[in-house]
């Protein structure tokens, strides 16, 4: 927002509020669940502390679960969400919000996914093999982290979901670049007015 303010000659708070309004408009409608073959995994954002490895309980890290349609040779649509922990309840949020019950789902062997098999009949777990069995998913995780660092530099736990919504709004419309701006403007017009106090 500092860069936006300097470039367009407005106050930093004005630029910040406008950016947040844009991100609000980019939020998923949850009306178009992922279908066919879907891969799911988790990752962390934050500074690792000494002695912390794997799925740690560190307060220094932000935990995210990601789901991605897998199409032959390329990725389809995707979604992600900040989660509290790696429990079945937390992981299940992205399934409920963004994955079709008929999808063919693949995850790694983490035990938190096992209870979800009861609700999703086409569910497979296989070893990650250090990411080798989920290459496309890990590419998208790296792409998101690079985008977050390169474009926004910093975010906190309270705003990370908004950056995630922004990223996947763009990602899911890569094939519709000519209409993405018009789509976004229409969303912003239809939204109820947003004030600084309402999103502070």
Task: Show which residues each predicted segment covers.
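Residue-level recognition of single "structural anchor" positions
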Residues: 1-200
């Amino acid at each position: 927002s500092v860069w936006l303010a300097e470039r367009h000659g407005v106050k930093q708070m004005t630029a910040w509020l406008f950016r947040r309004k844009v991100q609000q408009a980019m939020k998923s409608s949850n009306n178009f669940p992922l279908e066919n073959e879907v891969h799911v995994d988790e990752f962390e954002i934050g500074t690792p502390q000494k002695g912390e490895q794997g799925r740690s309980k560190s307060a220094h890290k932000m935990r995210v679960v990601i789901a991605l349609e897998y199409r032959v040779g390329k990725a389809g649509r995707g979604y992600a969400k900040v989660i509290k922990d790696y429990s079945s309840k937390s992981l299940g949020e992205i399934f409920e919000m963004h994955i079709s019950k008929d999808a063919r789902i693949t995850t790694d062997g983490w035990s938190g996914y096992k209870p979800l098999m009861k609700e999703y009949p086409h569910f497979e777990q296989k070893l990650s093999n250090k990411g080798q069995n989920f290459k496309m998913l890990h590419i998208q995780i790296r792409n998101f982290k690079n985008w977050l660092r390169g474009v926004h530099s910093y975010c906190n736990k309270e705003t990370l979901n908004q950056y995630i919504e922004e990223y996947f709004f763009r990602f899911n419309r890569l094939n519709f670049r000519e209409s993405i701006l018009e789509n976004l403007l229409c969303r912003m017009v239809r939204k109820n007015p947003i004030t600084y106090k309402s999103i502070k």
